[in-house]
């Protein structure tokens, strides 16, 4: 930690951000937006006392059971994901229900990406996110993940 003489603010160095913890979050029955905002706090490192905006201080997050996330109200029927294929008349629309059946990890990824900063640092922090369909996270046992209840 480096302490400046003229302020009381403590600034973390990039070398201090090397020890990264990993967390496992179960998305079963969780609301999409509330889950996403908690995950973004962990990815950016805002849950730490030594948070510094310009340093990648965040931890890694593994989200399991992505297909069991839900939305409140009528959004389940109204929410539409749009993408462009690159061709003329190539705008495609996929309803939430179809996207949940095909690519449940994309739903959470899309929500979290919208909350992250659109900078090089934000892209680097976003790479610490893993979203899994189902509840098996054995491939991440070597990181010794901590199970979080959000």
Curated annotation (Swiss-Prot):
InterPro entries: Ribosomal_uL13 (IPR005822), Ribosomal_uL13_bac-type (IPR005823), Ribosomal_uL13_sf (IPR036899). Disulfide bonds: none annotated. Keywords: Ribonucleoprotein, Ribosomal protein. SUPFAM superfamilies: Ribosomal protein L13. One of its GO terms (biological process) is translation. It comes from the Bacteria. Pfam families: Ribosomal_L13. GO terms for molecular function: mRNA binding; structural constituent of ribosome. One of its GO terms (cellular component) is cytosolic large ribosomal subunit. Belongs to the universal ribosomal protein uL13 family. Part of the 50S ribosomal subunit. This protein is one of the early assembly proteins of the 50S ribosomal subunit, although it is not seen to bind rRNA by itself. It is important during the early stages of 50S assembly. This is Large ribosomal subunit protein uL13. The gene is rplM.
């Amino acid at each position: 930690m480096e302490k400046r003489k003229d302020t009381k603010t403590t600034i973390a160095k990039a070398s201090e951000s090397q020890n990264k913890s990993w967390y496992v979050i179960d998305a079963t029955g969780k609301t999409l937006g509330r889950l996403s905002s908690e995950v973004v706090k962990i990815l950016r490192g805002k849950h730490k006392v030594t948070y510094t905006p310009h340093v990648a201080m965040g931890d890694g997050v593994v989200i399991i059971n992505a297909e069991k996330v839900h939305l409140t109200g009528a959004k389940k029927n109204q929410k539409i994901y749009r993408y462009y294929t690159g061709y003329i008349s190539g705008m495609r629309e996929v309803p939430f229900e179809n996207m949940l059946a095909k690519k449940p990890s994309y739903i959470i990824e899309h929500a979290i990406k919208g909350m992250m900063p659109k900078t090089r640092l934000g892209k680097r922090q976003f790479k610490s996110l893993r979203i899994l369909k189902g509840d098996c996270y054995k491939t991440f046992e070597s990181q010794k993940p901590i199970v979080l209840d959000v």
